[in-house]
Every structure is written in structure tokens, then in C-alpha cells.
């Protein structure tokens, strides 16, 4: 910068003057002027932030109002890994949810003496097996949630709602309600920088399963799992730690198992068996996949393949209860009912508290014509352990074989089970007319 000429005459500017005029005026702002700092200082994406003088990056603050230190601009700034605020108010639309049908529920369960109030905490309802009440409470809390931007709460409540509907065998209803999420592959659910997904992984898996099971769109379900598997592979490549890689590998293998599950549900047992045989696993995971293959080949009726897979699982890590049960089931599938009953009786003596073994023993006795013994075992199971679906179904079948007044006995059984305070043992409290064969 030069001094403009005055009166038509100029003078020579010395080097010292030029040096002084080239320097900008130093800032004299104090702590109270810190708010005048350009906004780019707090912008983690601003390229000029690291080059700012340290005096401006860390302005002095009044001692009476200490503030936490700002994260360094050359590292991950606060908020980059967190999901930006999204308005999920569309999940709170009461029209997206339905009144649960009660036509398939025995009357004793609708007017149970020990049913907890709907105002009970959802976790308590889930632990006690009251899935119908938990589903109702979840959607009430979801619709009345104060903040449509509370992603974690809203998505958790929706997950509880859909999972409870599945546990109540209302898959079609759950599939219909899951459509409130829209397209989970849209950019709306993605972090703009990290590409992280807003929706928790278990809920995404459930939505894919509902697309297949709720509407019978099996191919769509398989394609959905393959899409999630592609994301797993990409995340394994981008993972920064071994723990993160292990997590995504586990999810990838789980997607493969779920594909086999869809193949089983659509009746393609041979395809499911071949698919399971292609899954890569290590250690105990190899045993887990081999046991799944064993069950699939049992459904197919290929006993030699079932024995081969069971032998591979036993060589990996033997388990007397599981391996013995599968060996007995192979005998049962081969129509060797007496041998299967002997296998299960030995297991029942070693594991008297295992309800699965006791029920299978009762079924084998039923096939060998010992209906009274089978009825005794199943009746004792109902009294001593939390009743599960197949147990009630088998006992109702025995009632049909033993008496013409079986409907009265089934209804009495329903009243007895409805008088329980909770499900317990990881099973639901409510049972449907299907289990009682009403």
C-alpha cells in the first residue's frame, strides 16, 4: 500500500515505513469479544481452522464460566460420529398401528386374574412373558413420545412392538406395521459423513424377515439379507479395529444363516442344506453351523447327510445332551421308535430337568402306543416347567386320543395356564387357540 500523493508532489517512502504499513493491525479484543470469532473456528470441516493462530483458537474465557475444552480440529470432532438430528415424527402416526385381534385367544387369557396393568414398565411385561400388553404399551409410548427426534427411544419402542407381534404369531400384522419405516436403504437413514445407519442392526434384520414371512415374499427376504451381507463385507474392509471386524464378520455369518432359514420356510430344504455347507466358520461356530445342517437334513429326510453333519459337529466339540438328542431324533426319523424312546429315556435319567428331552420321550412313547405314559409325562411338564407351544399342542393331541370330551379338558388346561402370574423361563404367558387345538 502506498501513500497517495499530496499537492502534486510526492516523496520517497523509506523501507522502514513500508515494513510498518505492510503489517496488519494487531487485535486488541479481550475475553468478552470471544463471540466475534468467525464461525469457521467451530466448524470441524473448515480447512482454515488448523491454520488459525493459537490465540484465536483458544480465546481467554472468564474464570466464572469454565467450559470444556474443544476437540482438536485435526481429529474426529464431537458430533461427526453422532447421527445428525432427524425428525422421526412419522413413526408416531397412530394410523400406522392396529388394534390387536383377540379372536384366536382363549377367553381365560383375556380375563386372567393375575394379569399386570398396562401401565407396568415394558421391561417388566417382557420379562414376565406378557407380550400382548408389552406390544400395546410400546405403541402407546411411541405415539405419545415427547420428542420426534429421540431416535433411540422411538426405534426401540418400534422394535419392541414388532417383536412382540411376532411372538404372538401376528406376522402379517407386524409386516404391515413395519412399512411405517419406509425404505431403509434410503439416504435419509444414513449419516452424511460416516454412512452409519440410523436404525439398529437387529431391527433391520427383523424388517427383512417380516418382508419374507409376513407377506410370503421369500425372494425379497433373501435379497434383503444379501444386501445386508454386502454392507457387512464393506464394513469389514473399512473397520479400524479387530473388534469391529469381528463384529461385522459375526453379522455376515448370521445373514448367511438367516438365508438358510428363509429357504427352509419356503420349503427348499435341499437348497438350505447346500447353502449351510458353504458358510465359512471357525471353532465353535463350525459346530453351530454343522448342527443347523443336521436339522435341515433331518427335515429333508436325508439321514446319511444328517449323520455326517452330526459327526462333524461332535468331532469339533462334543455335547452329550445336544448330540444325544439329535441321535435320538435321527432314530425317530428312521421310524425306529423303540430305539428312539430308549435314547430319550437314558437322556431323561441324566437330565431330568430338561423339558425338551422329557417331551420328546413322551412323543416316542405315543408312537409306540403307550399313551397313558405319554400323557403322564406331558401333564407333569405342564405343572413343573413353563409351558411352551409344542408341549401344549402335544398334550391337547393326547386329550383328543384319550377322550371324546377333549374340548372340556383343553379348556380346563387353558384356565389353569391363564391363572399363572407370568410366563417365565423365556416363554410367553399367552397361548393361542392353535396350541390348544380349539
Predicted feature residues:
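TPR-repeat structural position
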Residues: 131-132, 171, 217-218, 269, ...
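Intrinsically disordered, low-complexity acidic/proline-rich regions
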Residues: 1-114
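Solenoid-like repeat scaffolds
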Residues: 105-110, 141-149, 181-186, 229-231, ...
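"A position-specific structural signal for the A-helix of alpha-solenoid helical repeats
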Residues: 120-124, 160-162, 167, 199-210, ...
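Internal amphipathic alpha-helical repeat/solenoid segments
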Residues: 88-157, 175-192
Amino acid at each position: 500500500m502506498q501513500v497517495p500523493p499530496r499537492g502534486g508532489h510526492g516523496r520517497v517512502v523509506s523501507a522502514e515505513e513500508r515494513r510498518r504499513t505492510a503489517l496488519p493491525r494487531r487485535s486488541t479484543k479481550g475475553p468478552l469479544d470471544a463471540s466475534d470469532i468467525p464461525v469457521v473456528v467451530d466448524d470441524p470441516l473448515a480447512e482454515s481452522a488448523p491454520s488459525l493462530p493459537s490465540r484465536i483458537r483458544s480465546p481467554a474465557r472468564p474464570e466464572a464460566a469454565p467450559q470444556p475444552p474443544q476437540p482438536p480440529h485435526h481429529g474426529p470432532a464431537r458430533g461427526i460420529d453422532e447421527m445428525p438430528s432427524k425428525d422421526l415424527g412419522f413413526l408416531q402416526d397412530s394410523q400406522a398401528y392396529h388394534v390387536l385381534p383377540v379372536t384366536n385367544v382363549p377367553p381365560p387369557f383375556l380375563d386372567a386374574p393375575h394379569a399386570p396393568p398396562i401401565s407396568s414398565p415394558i421391561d417388566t411385561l417382557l420379562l414376565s412373558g406378557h407380550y400382548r400388553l408389552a406390544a400395546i404399551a410400546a405403541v402407546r409410548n411411541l405415539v405419545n413420545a415427547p420428542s420426534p427426534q429421540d431416535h433411540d427411544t422411538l426405534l426401540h419402542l418400534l422394535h419392541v412392538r414388532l417383536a412382540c407381534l411376532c411372538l404372538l404369531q401376528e406376522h402379517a400384522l407386524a409386516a404391515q406395521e413395519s412399512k411405517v419405516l419406509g425404505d431403509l436403504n434410503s439416504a435419509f437413514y444414513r449419516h452424511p459423513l460416516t454412512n452409519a445407519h440410523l436404525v439398529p442392526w437387529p431391527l433391520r434384520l427383523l424388517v427383512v424377515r417380516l418382508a419374507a414371512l409376513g407377506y410370503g415374499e421369500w425372494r425379497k427376504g433373501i435379497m434383503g439379507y444379501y444386501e445386508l451381507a454386502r454392507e457387512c463385507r464393506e464394513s469389514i474392509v473399512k473397520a479400524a479395529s479387530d473388534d469391529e471386524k469381528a463384529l461385522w464378520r459375526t453379522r455376515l455369518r448370521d445373514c448367511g444363516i438367516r438365508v438358510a432359514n428363509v429357504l427352509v420356510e419356503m420349503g427348499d430344504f435341499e437348497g438350505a442344506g447346500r447353502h449351510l455347507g458353504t458358510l465359512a466358520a471357525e471353532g465353535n461356530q463350525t459346530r453351530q453351523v454343522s448342527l443347523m445342517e443336521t436339522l435341515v437334513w433331518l427335515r429333508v429326510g436325508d439321514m446319511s447327510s444328517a449323520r455326517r453333519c452330526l459327526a462333524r459337529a461332535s468331532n469339533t466339540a462334543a455335547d452329550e445332551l445336544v448330540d444325544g438328542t439329535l441321535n435320538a431324533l435321527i432314530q425317530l426319523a428312521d421310524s425306529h421308535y423303540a430305539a428312539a424312546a430308549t435314547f430319550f429315556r437314558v437322556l431323561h435319567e441324566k437330565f431330568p430337568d430338561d423339558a425338551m428331552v422329557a417331551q420328546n420321550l413322551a412323543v416316542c412313547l405315543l408312537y409306540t402306543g403307550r399313551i397313558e405314559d405319554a400323557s403322564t409325562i406331558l401333564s407333569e411338564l405342564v405343572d413343573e416347567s413353563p409351558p411352551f407351544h409344542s408341549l401344549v399342542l402335544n398334550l391337547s393331541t393326547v386329550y383328543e386320543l384319550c377322550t371324546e370330551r377333549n374340548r372340556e379338558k383343553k379348556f380346563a388346561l387353558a384356565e389353569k395356564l391363564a391363572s399363572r402370574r407370568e410366563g417365565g423361563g423365556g416363554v410367553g404367558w399367552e397361548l393361542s387357540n392353535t396350541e390348544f387345538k380349539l
